[in-house]
Every structure is written in structure tokens, then in C-alpha cells.
Amino acid sequence: MLIHLKPEEIIAAAHHAAVRQSAKAVRTELGQIKNHKISNQSDFAVNYAGLLGEYAVARSINAKVDTALMIAGDGGTDMVLNGNTIQVKTNMMPENVLIFNQLEHFNTDWAILCSIESASSVAIHGFISKGKFAKTYHRHDWGYGNRYCVKAEALAPIEKFYEAIGLT
């Protein structure tokens, strides 16, 4: 599913990415947290891409993006719908793969994979439950250690998400 973001969603994503990046920079400088980023992109770019994915998913499933500022990240939960916790993973790699650095980092009920297609378009590739991910993942090393992965083709289409969480 391709979502064309509205200007106000793009602006909100940029705003919240800047707030998160600024807070993280201050806390890192004060020694309160450690930056665990492995990407060669800036913290702002990583947060911005993630928030674009979150806004696309929120619109597609009629949920609200959690923009609360947490001391050391959101713990994985990007939104909650009908009591179900959801983590949105926005992949910026050429191949569409849902990736967790560690298996225990999948600590929500569901994960949804997105990719940035253009400055205002986000593709939602599908979703998977925590249990199914644990049974179907494969490991892959992109040069910085093994990661836990499921290819987009193995995900359920986002159009079936309401059915999966019992809302239909």
C-alpha cells in the first residue's frame, strides 16, 4: 500500500524528528545516554524517516502516532490500537526487510514494515506478530553483526491488520 503523506504530516514528522534529535544530543553530551546508532545517516534523518513511516501507518490503520519524548527512546512502541502495541520499522535499504538488531527488541504485539518511496510517499509492506516473527526470522549480517530479519514477502498485507487484531 502506498501512502501519499499530507503536508501537515510531513511537517509534523520533521518537527518531532528535530525535537527528538535535539533532546538526544543534549542527553548524550551530558553523558545521560549513549548513542547506539549504527547508521551512517544523522540522528535527524533516522528519526525523520521513522516518523514518516509512523504517520503513514497511523493514517492507514486509523491510529495515533506517539510523539511523547522519552529519556532513552520509546522502548519500541510507536502506537497502540485497541490495546495492541505496534512498532513501525521504516527501512531505507534497497531490499524490503523487517529488521531487529536483537530478537528481544521486538517487544510489541505487532511490527509493521515501511519504506520511503519519495519525499512524500511511504510504502507499507505489511505486518507480522511477535510470535510469527520468532518462528520465521532468518539472520543476516550487513557488516555490523547478525540481525534478525523477515522479508517483506512473508508479511501479511496491511489491509488485513484490523482482522488480525479483532476489529472486523
Give the ranges of each region predicted by the language model.
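Nucleic-acid endonuclease domains
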Residues: 1-82, 89-168
